[in-house]
Regions:
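Hydrophobic positions on the alpha1 helix immediately C-terminal to the Walker A/P-loop
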Residues: 46, 50
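Conserved inter-motif catalytic segment of the P-loop NTP-binding fold
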Residues: 11, 18, 22-24, 28, ...
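Phosphate-binding/switch region of NTP-binding enzymes
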Residues: 34, 40-45, 71-74, 126, ...
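Gly/Ala-rich phosphate-binding loop of Rossmann-like dinucleotide-binding domains
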Residues: 55
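Short glycine-biased active-site loop of nucleotidyltransferases that positions the nucleotide triphosphate
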Residues: 63-64, 189
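Detector for small/aliphatic-rich hydrophobic stretches
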Residues: 1-17
């Protein structure tokens, strides 16, 4: 129903849909997921293991589901040739199913249209930005909601339009006494824009695992 310069939509006009999951109930398709943890607690190791599993079409952890597909993995902290690829090879990944966006001399930020284009061109089921702070841009203050929100909205729209599962890897802050939702670096809007927030940490009863 048109009213002035906007429309009114009643919920009776909206078709209910189920969430589709890449990995139930942790990583949904077409939405954002945050994966957080302290440095050294295994965030990248976990992500590379998951990507390797997808590349080979094997059973996902704690699941009877097998999913195969292309993953786009963007890592701004480690070298591709001497760190990332050797780690994927140790996980016995099929590297023909794993790629990254080479943006040449142009920094790849979360609002870059090349992200959506790369997902569509490859048919990727999963895209990972690791770590999130490396992809927000130098003029964006990730601690300010009005600064980070447009980037999160853009990336959220990209996930929805392409149906790709997008995972943002982030570090935790040093506030050990705070609630888990407030332990992530940056504005709470980062978590609020995400459908799923995952926390990786060491088992207190077995710190070696």
């Amino acid at each position: 129903m048109a009213v002035g310069n906007y429309d009114i939509t009643y919920f009776t006009e909206v078709e209910s849909k189920k969430v589709n999951w890449l990995w139930y109930p942790y990583i949904p398709y077409g939405k954002l997921t945050i994966l957080q943890g302290d440095p050294g607690d295994g965030k990248t190791t976990f992500i590379l293991s998951l990507i390797a599993t997808l590349s080979n079409g094997e059973h996902l952890p704690f699941s009877e589901t097998k999913v195969s597909g292309i993953s786009i993995y963007q890592n701004a902290e480690d070298d591709i040739s001497d760190t990332i690829k050797p780690r994927l090879e140790r996980h016995k990944a099929n590297c023909e199913q794993i790629c990254f966006i080479d943006s040449k001399d142009t920094p790849l930020f979360m609002d870059n249209d090349n992200i959506e284009k790369a997902i569509k061109d490859t048919g990727a089921k999963l895209l990972v930005l690791d770590p999130i702070q490396s992809f927000i841009g130098s003029n964006v203050d990730m601690n300010r909601a009005n600064s980070i929100r447009p980037l999160m909205t853009k990336l959220k729209d990209t996930a929805q339009k392409t149906g790709c599962a997008i995972v943002l890897v982030g570090h935790l802050n040093k506030n050990n006494s705070g609630k888990a939702n407030y332990r992530g670096l940056g504005s709470i809007d980062i978590s609020a824009a995400s459908r799923s927030v995952l926390l990786i940490g060491k088992d207190p009863s077995n710190p070696q695992n």
